[in-house]
Amino acid sequence: MTNIRKTHPLMEIINNAFIDLPAPSNISSWWNFGSLLGICLILQILTGLFLAMHYTSDTTTAFSSVTHICRDVNYGWIIRYMHANGASMFFICLFLHVGRGLYYGSYTFLETWNVGVILLFATMATAFMGYVLPWGQMSFWGATVITNLLSAIPYIGTNLVEWIWGGFSVDKATLTRFFAFHFILPFIITALAMVHLLFLHETGSNNPTGISSDTDKIPFHPYYTIKDILGALLLILALMLLVLFAPDLLGDPDNYTPANPLNTPPHIKPEWYFLFAYAILRSIPNELGGVLALVLSILILVLMPLLHTSKQRSMMFRPISQCMFWILVADLLTLTWIGGQPVEHPYIIIGQLASIMYFLLILVLMPAAGTIENNLLKW
């Protein structure tokens, strides 16, 4: 008798994706982040669902409803903080996952990579709208500032912003629609993640060497299931340490003040995971230029396959490219720091230099390093 997992139409899909899947024998812990992102997504949907049961998307009661969740709902505080800090864990995993893709040349799987970039944009949109929902000061002013950026688009900008707001300012209509979108987007992300996985399984996984591993495959289960479980336990440990010991570490104190359109906070800034892009936006004096740079800072990932000049796929054996990669990482950390600083003397110029360096590294220095390494191979 054939095993049910190989004959049942649904079980067969699960079997081919998570059990009998041929996987390279040498993939490192950097390949754990896909499954960790899946766990983060499930966790966010579940905690979000329970929060939505008690949340009200009305400007007069939104802030109070979040307070009510934390004070009166059974274990509401832990659900709320797991959701808020779960978003941070989600983005940590996302950045590491993308970084892994850049380092090991995984972007040569074009379809998988492009769906991944769409996933990144969708996740960023979801997180932004989620940050507006508690209706604190930073929620309100963050929503006002970021949506207002669209007014920089020539001709249609102002109409577009008012259409998104549902009025002439960020108000009840904005909050209600943001809640609706924040609820639906994670399910769209789940569907996109399945497409991402579908395209990945067409080619099979990359590996640290960047060389085809078709001659040396092992079954996904038990080898990588146990490895993923270890990763998941470490992720949950890190999340719960954050939730139980420092739940407000990554948040903004201003968000504990109810939204007030008449009082602007001294420093408007987004959550930490958007600071690098925010720093790039602020470093350009022209509004439209800043918005374009902001979008391009993420959209540039789509160009990565075109900018690959090396004869080798992975950076494992390319020391010059490795240097460029780690300079890029340091540059992104610098941008993240600058994004959280006020707009004054030393920070402005540091932000501008870091922004120039970001685009210079990706568009010029990394492709140049690949070409130099190709020539070194001839020696």
From Swiss-Prot:
Primary residence: mitochondrion
Residues annotated for heme b b562 binding in this entry: H83, H182
Pfam family, one: Cytochrom_B_C
GO molecular function terms attached to this record: metal ion binding; ubiquinol-cytochrome-c reductase activity
Keyword vocabulary terms for this entry: Electron transport, Heme, Iron, Membrane, Metal-binding, Mitochondrion, Mitochondrion inner membrane, Respiratory chain, Transmembrane, Transmembrane helix, Transport, Ubiquinone
GO BP terms: mitochondrial electron transport, ubiquinol to cytochrome c
Compartmental location: Mitochondrion inner membrane
InterPro entries named among the record's database cross-references: Cyt_b/b6_C, Cyt_b/b6_C_sf, Cyt_b/b6_N, Cytb/b6-like_sf, Cytochrome_b, Cytochrome_b_C_euk/bac, Cytochrome_b_N_euk/bac, Di-haem_cyt_TM
Membrane topology: Multi-pass membrane protein
Cofactor(s) required, per the database record: heme b
Record-stated family: Belongs to the cytochrome b family.
Other remarks on this protein: Heme 1 (or BL or b562) is low-potential and absorbs at about 562 nm, and heme 2 (or BH or b566) is high-potential and absorbs at about 566 nm.
Biological role stated in the UniProt entry: Component of the ubiquinol-cytochrome c reductase complex (complex III or cytochrome b-c1 complex) that is part of the mitochondrial respiratory chain. The b-c1 complex mediates electron transfer from ubiquinol to cytochrome c. Contributes to the generation of a proton gradient across the mitochondrial membrane that is then used for ATP synthesis.
UniProt protein name: Cytochrome b
Naturally occurring in which organism (per UniProt): Connochaetes gnou
Lineage: Eukaryota, Metazoa, Chordata, Craniata, Vertebrata
The encoding gene: MT-CYB
